[in-house]
């Protein structure tokens, strides 16, 4: 490898040793001054990349966990909303049935009250008619007793009272 130098110009071992010592000295200076900062910088960069990867992985896991929580919350909200809707429907149905039942009970009560009122009015009308007929009979009897009537007079008297009864009843 160095044979071409030896033939034509000669190899100076002193220069070679000097260059080798300078090279080794330069390597040592680079190691002391530059190598440690460069390796430290490279290590710091590797640590930062590793931390960034770990942070990204953690963020991805957190995001996935958050997505799962949101999906669970959404499912829970949907379930709760469905429960609320079902409860509202059931309550509405129950209230409707209660209203219908109450209305039927009110109608039945009104019907019974109307029947009682009708029966009372009928009883009052019958009582009034009895009283009127009794009064009329007493009046007829008293007039008959006061005078003795012939058959034609008696018939005319009864007809006049019946006619008077019809007029009073109409008014």
Swiss-Prot record:
NCBIfam families attached to this UniProt entry: ATP_synt_b
Quaternary structure and interacting proteins, as annotated: F-type ATPases have 2 components, F(1) - the catalytic core - and F(0) - the membrane proton channel. F(1) has five subunits: alpha(3), beta(3), gamma(1), delta(1), epsilon(1). F(0) has three main subunits: a(1), b(2) and c(10-14). The alpha and beta chains form an alternating ring which encloses part of the gamma chain. F(1) is attached to F(0) by a central stalk formed by the gamma and epsilon chains, while a peripheral stalk is formed by the delta and b chains.
Function as written in the Swiss-Prot or TrEMBL entry: F(1)F(0) ATP synthase produces ATP from ADP in the presence of a proton or sodium gradient. F-type ATPases consist of two structural domains, F(1) containing the extramembraneous catalytic core and F(0) containing the membrane proton channel, linked together by a central stalk and a peripheral stalk. During catalysis, ATP synthesis in the catalytic domain of F(1) is coupled via a rotary mechanism of the central stalk subunits to proton translocation. Component of the F(0) channel, it forms part of the peripheral stalk, linking F(1) to F(0).
GO (cellular component) term, any one: plasma membrane
Gene Ontology terms, MF aspect: proton-transporting ATP synthase activity, rotational mechanism; proton-transporting ATPase activity, rotational mechanism
Family: Belongs to the ATPase B chain family.
Protein name stated in the entry: ATP synthase subunit b
Organism: Levilactobacillus brevis (strain ATCC 367 / BCRC 12310 / CIP 105137 / JCM 1170 / LMG 11437 / NCIMB 947 / NCTC 947)
Transmembrane segments: 10-30
Cellular localisation: Cell membrane
Coiled coil (residue ranges): none
Top-level taxon of the source organism: Bacteria
Keywords: ATP synthesis, Cell membrane, CF(0), Hydrogen ion transport, Ion transport, Membrane, Transmembrane, Transmembrane helix, Transport
Name of encoding gene: atpF
HAMAP family documented for this protein: ATP_synth_b_bprime
Cited InterPro entries: ATP_synth_B-like_membr_sf, ATP_synth_b/b'su_bac/chlpt, ATP_synth_F0_bsu_bac, ATP_synthase_B_chain
Mode of membrane association: Single-pass membrane protein
CDD domains per the UniProt record, alphabetical: ATP-synt_Fo_b
Main subcellular location: membrane
């Amino acid at each position: 490898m160095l044979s071409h130098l030896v033939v034509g110009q000669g190899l100076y071992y002193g220069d070679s040793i000097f260059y080798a010592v300078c090279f080794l000295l330069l390597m040592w200076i680079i190691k002391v001054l530059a190598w440690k900062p460069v390796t430290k910088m490279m290590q710091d960069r590797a640590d930062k990349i590793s931390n960034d990867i770990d942070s990204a992985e953690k963020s991805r896991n957190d995001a996935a966990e958050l997505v799962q929580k949101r999906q669970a919350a959404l499912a829970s909200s949907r379930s709760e909303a469905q429960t609320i809707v079902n409860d509202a429907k059931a309550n509405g149905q129950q209230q409707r049935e209660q209203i219908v039942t109450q209305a039927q009970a009110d109608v039945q009560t009104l019907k019974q009250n109307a029947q009682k009122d009708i029966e009372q009015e009928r009883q009052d009308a019958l009582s009034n008619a009895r009283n009127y007929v009794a009064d009329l009979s007493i009046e007829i009897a008293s007039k008959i007793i006061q005078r003795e009537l012939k058959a034609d007079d008696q018939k005319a008297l009864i007809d006049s009272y019946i006619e008077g009864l019809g007029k009073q009843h109409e008014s």
